[in-house]
Regions:
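STAS-like cytosolic regulatory interaction modules
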Residues: 1-57, 68-120
Length: 120
């Protein structure tokens, strides 16, 4: 499940309690809808690990989407974890202060048993 365009791609792997989302490309006003769709498809009670290692651009629209996803997941008993952000993206997270409210880790994602749904 998800969306694909020439500048952005998202893959989702669903496990029993953890959902892995891998984003690749640019997250900006033109592509944030695809990211938002993938994030909102995840049950709020889940731990959502968003791998940002393939993202080179994170605009204000992307930051807003991440903040909203964090609030939605937290309200449902879940958690958003940002994994391996590119150095440019990590800087955006620090400058905006999002790193203070959303956990950011440098670990490689653990494999998730389950199915993988790929954006088209």
């Amino acid at each position: 499940m998800g969306q694909r365009d020439d500048r952005f791609h998202v893959e989702v792997s669903v496990g029993a309690r953890v959902v892995e989302v891998r984003a690749t490309g640019e997250i900006d006003v033109a592509t944030v809808g695809a990211l938002r769709s993938a994030l909102w498809a995840v049950p709020a009670r889940s731990v959502l690990r968003l791998d940002l290692s393939g993202v080179g651009v994170l605009s204000a629209a992307g930051v807003r989407a991440l903040a909203a996803a964090h609030l939605r997941l937290r309200a449902g008993g879940g958690e958003l974890v940002l994994v391996r952000p590119d150095p440019v993206v990590a800087r955006v997270l620090r400058v905006t202060g999002l790193h203070r409210v959303v956990r950011v880790i440098d670990d490689a994602p653990a494999p998730v048993a389950g199915r993988t749904l790929i954006a088209a």
